[in-house]
Amino acid sequence: MLTVPGLCWLCRMPLALGHWGICSVCSRATRTDKTLCPQCGLPATHSHLPCGRCLQKPPPWQRLVTVADYAPPLSPLIHQLKFSRRSEIASALSRLLLLEVLHARRTTGLQLPDRIVSVPLWQRRHWRRGFNQSDLLCQPLSRWLHCQWDSEAVTRTRATATQHFLSARLRKRNLKNAFRLELPVQGRHMVIVDDVVTTGSTVAEIAQLLLRNGAAAVQVWCLCRTL
């Protein structure tokens, strides 16, 4: 997908503000039309009440905000952000996530955080890629929402196997004790920001770490939730 300055990256129509990257029509069109559980973010009967899965076995976070399923048109943009060094895409994707957060705040009273944290990469992967895509999403979000963010708030303690090829059980084992908290979170409302949440194993491990260290509440914000 080619990004052209001044044109919407999805429909190629002129933009009122060129740096947005995605026009308001396409921004609305990217949102999922499925009813999602407000806690786990998976398809559910009601969008304002936890689903049966969460009532039986709730995840270690209280809310999950997502824009859409991991599918076109967002999936190609996320792929370019991560693997083609297209970091200019991050601001446009961050804006999509911001619009979803503000929508959830208007419709459900979503609480804004005291601090947002990135999902960290292992040092070698960060060095190879040159950036952490989660950091690129957090940077504008923290500025727009006037909340704290530090790219080193959570760090990885070791390399882990690629999650994509592991079962849910092995993903959980793979991530056990893989993260370390570097800043105090006692009594704070925290948000974990990631580009894609699949099984939720990674954000669950970080959420548990935050709660063990005294966080008052944890939310997860992501561009895409695999539905």
Curated annotation (Swiss-Prot):
InterPro entries: ComF/GntX_DNA_util-trans, Competence_ComF, PRibTrfase_dom, PRTase-like. Signal peptide: none annotated. It holds the Pfam family Pribosyltran. Disruption phenotype: Mutants are unable to use DNA as a sole carbon and energy source and show decreased competitive fitness when cocultured with wild-type cells. One of its GO terms (biological process) is carbon utilization. Required for the use of extracellular DNA as a nutrient. Has been suggested to be involved in gluconate metabolism. Belongs to the ComF/GntX family. This is DNA utilization protein YhgH. It comes from Escherichia coli (strain K12).
